[in-house]
From Swiss-Prot:
Description of how the protein assembles with itself and partners: Part of the 50S ribosomal subunit.
Keyword Iron (UniProt): no
Entry-linked Pfam families: Ribosomal_L4
Gene field: rplD
Molecular function, one GO term: rRNA binding
Disulfide linkage: none
Similarity comment text for this entry: Belongs to the universal ribosomal protein uL4 family.
Name this protein carries in UniProt: Large ribosomal subunit protein uL4
Feature: compositional bias, Basic residues: 59-74
InterPro entries (UniProt xref): Ribosomal_uL4, Ribosomal_uL4-like, Ribosomal_uL4_dom_sf
Superkingdom: Bacteria
GO-annotated biological processes: translation
Bias (Basic and acidic residues) ranges: 49-58
Length: 206
């Protein structure tokens, strides 16, 4: 299939032959949801922690005698029933949040996302995008001219000037093709991909 390629001024300059399997796939919402949630789950650090009753720093002495007080019996102050006591099922930093997605499903999910972006006019193919110096003002002007208010920019290889000039913009993210992930693709309003990045996508996922 043919993709329209624009230049940095937003003008159509040529067409690019691209794989139908990558940009012409039907949208599979369940698969895309699975791929995105698996990516987010695998990115979790797993650093939350709570204490159980054995880890609470309280006396192990019985708070009061077993009978004769009229109160419910109690064994120790670290009981989960008491304020300040341990959790019954505490969260652990060793908890495993990872979801397994095999390579075939991941490739199909990425292709479904790219195809849907193209159908909904959210995917822009550009011949190349560069800035002369690492200045946010220069990149912001270029992004505004291309209508990129909330955009993911994917290049074949990361240009240092482009990266440095864009990292101060909260609504724009510049990455190289090898760093592309399903969450970033669905998160932004526009996805700008260079010709070189398209070729890399075809090698990885087509």
């Amino acid at each position: 299939m043919e993709l329209k390629v624009i230049n940095q001024q937003g003008q159509a300059v040529e067409s690019l032959q691209a794989a139908e399997t990558l940009f012409g796939r039907e949208y599979n919402e369940a698969l895309v949801h699975q791929v995105v949630t698996a990516y987010l789950a695998n990115a979790r650090a797993g650093n939350r922690a709570q204490k159980d009753r054995s880890e609470i720093n309280k006396s192990t002495k019985k708070p009061f005698r077993q009978k004769g007080t009229g109160r419910a019996r109690a064994g120790r102050a670290s009981s989960p029933l008491w304020r300040g006591g341990g959790k019954v099922f505490p969260n652990s930093p060793d908890e495993n949040f990872s979801h397994k997605v095999n390579r075939k499903m991941f490739r199909a999910g990425m292709a479904a996302i790219l195809s849907e972006l193209l159908r909904s006019d959210r995917l822009v193919i550009i011949d190349d995008i560069k800035v002369d110096s690492p200045k946010t003002k220069e990149f912001a002007a270029k992004a505004k001219a291309l209508g990129l208010e909330n955009a993911l920019v994917i290049t074949g290889e990361l240009d240092e000037n482009l990266y440095l000039s864009s990292r101060n913009l909260s609504n724009v993210l510049v990455i190289e093709a090898s760093q592309a992930d399903p969450y970033s693709l669905v998160r932004f309003d526009k996805v700008v991909v260079t010709r070189d990045a398209v070729k890399q996508f075809e090698e990885q996922w087509a």
